[in-house]
């Protein structure tokens, strides 16, 4: 169906943009971080995350991929403007802080708007959260204020159906020793963090009309992320109709880099926080 959207809740790396260290430097100003504090700057980037909305009858289903450290700020900025109230399900790609650091903030929803939220993740990620967020798994372990009521469901590499949408896990490497998930759904393949994509996963991605791919920074290689150049090379292999780059550091000046990307002869550009795109589910 066409009555569906994807909203970029965040398009930045773990520390987000701006960096406080850049804003407080007295010697040399960081141009991107300085610009990012201006109203509506595309250089303002929170942790990489997306919201998928699908209309079923008169109701919207809201599915989020990852809730990082800046998730609550993203929700404050984006949810009211788009009349988003409840969260139906959350998919987790991995358990770094920029993907799960906002789990605790989900208490605002389960205390005030809905009874519970369903979380979908791999067994090893559930085990990790059981240690880092023990009180969210065993809710009787915490005394005091209300705790988010989360229902954890284990997924593996097999495709699964969620709210009538087919999701295909995309195993990718996030560094040499950590395999994480991207997801293919509808006409989109979403890979937020990767340094290596196998031929097997590449074959799953081929045919996507929209590719959303990690592109940390230009030129300088990184052990756990694609560079801009690596992302462009991969996008050309996939040959999607549109490619959106995400997970950017302050080395990416949004408008300048997007202007330079026009020479690549494919439709590729950095996404920005709050950006909405129509999708097919």
Would you name each region that the model predicts?
Residues 196-281:
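Cap/insert and terminal regions of metallo-dependent hydrolase folds
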Residues 1-191, 200, 258-281:
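Binuclear metal-dependent hydrolase catalytic cores
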């Amino acid at each position: 169906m066409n009555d569906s959207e994807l909203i970029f809740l965040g398009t930045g790396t773990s520390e987000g943009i701006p960096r406080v260290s850049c804003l407080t430097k007295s010697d040399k100003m960081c141009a991107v971080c300085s610009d990012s504090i201006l109203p509506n700057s595309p250089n303002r980037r929170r942790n990489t995350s997306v919201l998928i909305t699908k209309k079923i009858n008169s109701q919207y289903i809201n599915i989020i991929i990852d809730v990082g450290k800046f998730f609550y700020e993203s929700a404050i900025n984006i949810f009211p403007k788009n009349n988003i109230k409840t969260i139906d399900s959350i998919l987790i790609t991995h358990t770094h802080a920029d993907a799960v650091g906002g789990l605790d903030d989900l208490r605002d929803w389960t205390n005030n708007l809905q009874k519970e939220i369903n979380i979908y993740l791999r067994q090893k990620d559930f085990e990790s959260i059981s240690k880092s967020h023990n009180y969210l798994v065993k809710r009787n372990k915490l005394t005091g204020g209300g705790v988010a009521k989360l229902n954890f469901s284990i997924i593996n590499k097999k495709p699964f159906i969620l709210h009538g949408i087919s999701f295909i896990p995309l195993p990718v490497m996030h560094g040499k020793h950590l395999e994480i998930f991207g997801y293919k759904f509808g006409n989109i393949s979403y890979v937020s963090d990767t340094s290596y994509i196998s031929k097997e996963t590449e074959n799953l991605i081929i045919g996507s009309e929209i590719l959303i791919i990690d592109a940390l920074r230009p030129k300088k290689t990184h052990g756990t992320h694609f560079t801009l150049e690596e992302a462009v090379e991969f996008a050309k292999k996939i040959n999607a109709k549109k490619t959106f780059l995400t997970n950017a550091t302050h080395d990416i000046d949004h408008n300048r880099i997007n202007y330079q990307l026009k020479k690549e002869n494919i439709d590729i550009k950095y996404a920005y926080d709050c950006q909405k795109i129509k999708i097919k589910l």
